[in-house]
Amino acid sequence: MKRIVALQRSVLWGCLLAIGIGGVAQTPPSAEHHHSHKSSVKEFDRWPAGTSPQEIGKRVAERYVQSDYLNLRRTPPTPTIIYPEVCTWYGALTFAQLTGDSALTSRLVNRFDPLLGDRASLVPKPNHVDNTVFAAVPLEIYVEDKDRKYLDLGTSLADQQWQDPEPDGLTNQTRFWIDDMYMITAAQVQAYRATGDKKYLDHAAQEMVAYLDKLQQPNGLFYHAPDVPFFWGRGNGWVAAGMTELLRSLPENHPDRPQILNAYRKMLASLLKYQNQDGTWNQLIDHPEAWPETSSTGMFAFAMITGVKSGWLDKKMYAPAARKAWLGLVHYVDAAGDVSNVCEGTNKKNDLDYYLTRARNTGDLHGEAPILWSASALLR
């Protein structure tokens, strides 16, 4: 019933747009593509030597752009670009744009261009959430430089995600793993930011609401999946980051915004209770015996920094925690730009020890991406 109501509200929203109420359809947002206001936050103004978002972001972005495609560095290589690279690439692009580093932007775009030519076989087919998220990169390039070839590729992938939807309007890629709440959102919201077409926002919002109804628990946190009752750190990070990206672009009068914003605030309030003294969060958020994990910490930092600066969260309560999260995170970035204590790739499993004993990787792009998102958030 909730999904039917969501569909009806989505149709109403589309009709309002068609007659000019609530915004002008088909008008791409600005390069900064979000409607939240930039707020001065004293906790984000000064940083100890070697910890500024400019310095850390540059180091991590350089480490990324100097490396070969991640899928080709694996043994054996995987056939197409994989999502940790997509998330890092997107973060590096936003960081370069916000710092005015045109040389870095050019290198990031040059890294992409072979995928439009002789290495096109590395572009993943949009048949799974982890593949379709690839759209976020060409769409971000288009937002920044307005070259149509990037738009055509990105919107083609985003459109195919809804080519044959379920009867309730959800994408057929829906699987109710919390990871999806970022993967689906990134592709669809970036398509909106590039085109101004509200259908992409409606896709992302409808999907987000369905996942919120299914996976958010009374304490505000999220199970990895309906049958896996654990509060996995990075999984919850994907949710926090996905809601944040959606809220950055979702208009104040969109019918699904209140539910999504309330869910975001409920989650962030819960996270405050579980933050470690050094600013990190654990591999299993509510397990003190679990180890501090950096990819989740970076994602929560991104969500919290953005919420404070956008006015979604109380500044007095959350700004100190967001600062502590950033400083706790950068402690794990080495001189080469590699991040340690990153949980390895993790499928869902109803087994506590499975989560507690995951490998702690160094140099894993799962950990580098959210550092770039957080650095970008601090610079917006």
Predicted regions and their residues:
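CBM-like carbohydrate-recognition segments
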Residues: 33-86, 98-114, 118-135, 141-144, ...
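Extended ligand-binding clefts on enzyme/binding-domain cores
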Residues: 178-179, 189-284, 290-301, 313-347, ...
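N-terminal secretory signal peptides that target proteins for export/translocation
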Residues: 1-7
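Asp-box/WD-like beta-propeller blade repeats and closely related beta-sheet repeat scaffolds
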Residues: 150-186
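Bacterial N-terminal signal peptides
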Residues: 10-22
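Aromatic-lined, polymer-binding surfaces characteristic
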Residues: 81-85, 89-92, 124-142, 176-188, ...
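Helix-capping and short linker residues that terminate individual alpha-solenoid repeat units
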Residues: 69, 100, 116-121, 146, ...
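Bacterial Sec-dependent signal peptides at the C-terminal "C-region" and cleavage site
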Residues: 21-37
